[in-house]
Amino acid sequence: SFSCMQFQDLGRSNHQNVDLLIKKVYKTVKTTRKKAVFGVSPAGNLDNLYLNNSYYCDVKKWMSSTGYIDYICPQIYWTFTHTVCPYKATCKRWANLKRNKNVKLYIGLAGYRAGLSKAQAKAVYDIGWSKSNTILKREVLYGRSTKKVSGYVLFSYADLNRKAAAKDIANLKKVFK
C-alpha cells in the first residue's frame, strides 16, 4: 500500500528531480554559450509552489544559490484587489526573498487580462480587471518602488494590439517613456 511516508518521500524525490533538471539545464546553457541567460517563470502564488503534491520547485533555493538560474519571473497575474494573491503583497513577498546577487527578479504581468469585461473578470475571480485601465501601469510603478525588481515581462505579445486592452497598454507605455 502507498503510505503517507511514501508520499512524502515521493514529494521529496520529485523536488530533487526538478532541482537536478534546472541545475543541468543551467549548466548546459552556460556550457553552450557562457553569456546566455537562463531562467524560469513559475506560478506567482508562493504558497502553492510549496505544496508537496504539485509543482515540486524550490524557487527559494534557485534564487539564493549559484548554478540554478540567472533570473526568475513569477507570473503575478492578479490585481491589487485579488482576494488570495493581491499584486502588492505578492510582489513584495517575491521581492523580499533571499536572492543571490547574480539572480535578477522580473515580474510577469497579465497583459491578457487587461480590458476584461465584468463577466470575464468574474470568470477569472479577479473583478479588478474590469474596474481600471491603469492596473498594469500601477503594477510596474509598485515593482519599481521596491528597488528589487529588475524588469517586467508582459504575457502575451498579442495583447499589445488587442482592442479591449488598448487603454491599459497606452497607460503602461507611459511609464516606459
Region spans (language model):
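Polysaccharide-binding and catalytic clefts of secreted carbohydrate-active enzymes
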Residues: 1-65, 77-78
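Substrate-binding cleft of secreted/luminal carbohydrate-active enzymes
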Residues: 60, 64-84, 94-177
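Charged helix-capping and loop-helix junction motifs
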Residues: 52-57, 86-92
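Non-membrane alpha-helical structural segments and their capping/turn regions in soluble enzymes
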Residues: 12-23, 84, 88, 129-137
